[in-house]
Amino acid sequence: MDTRLLVIAAPVLVAASWALFNIGRLAIQQIQRLSR
């Protein structure tokens, strides 16, 4: 594994997981609001 590749991949993975986490949390809030 090339170190430079890891340096590039790590922030991308962090950003992607953070975005998915936020989208999932918003989706759950919307579903809870609709189900009420």
Curated annotation (Swiss-Prot):
Transmembrane annotation, as ranges: 5-23
NCBIfam families per the UniProt record, alphabetical: PRK13240.1
Keyword DNA repair recorded: no
Compartments (UniProt record): Plastid, Chloroplast thylakoid membrane
InterPro entries registered for this protein in UniProt: PSII_PsbY (IPR009388)
GO cellular component, one term: photosystem II
Annotated membrane topology: Single-pass membrane protein
Name of the molecule in the record: Photosystem II reaction center protein Y
Key words, A-Z: Chloroplast, Membrane, Photosynthesis, Photosystem II, Plastid, Thylakoid, Transmembrane, Transmembrane helix
Gene Ontology BP, a term: photosynthesis
Function as written in the Swiss-Prot or TrEMBL entry: Loosely associated component of the core of photosystem II (PSII), it is not always seen in crystals. PSII is a light-driven water plastoquinone oxidoreductase, using light energy to abstract electrons from H(2)O, generating a proton gradient subsequently used for ATP formation.
GO molecular function, one term: manganese ion binding
Lumenal side: 1-4
Family per similarity comment: Belongs to the PsbY family.
Record bears the keyword Plastid: yes
Listed HAMAP family: PSII_PsbY
Residues exposed to the Stromal side: 24-36
Assembly and binders: PSII is composed of 1 copy each of membrane proteins PsbA, PsbB, PsbC, PsbD, PsbE, PsbF, PsbH, PsbI, PsbJ, PsbK, PsbL, PsbM, PsbT, PsbX, PsbY, PsbZ, Psb30/Ycf12, at least 3 peripheral proteins of the oxygen-evolving complex and a large number of cofactors. It forms dimeric complexes.
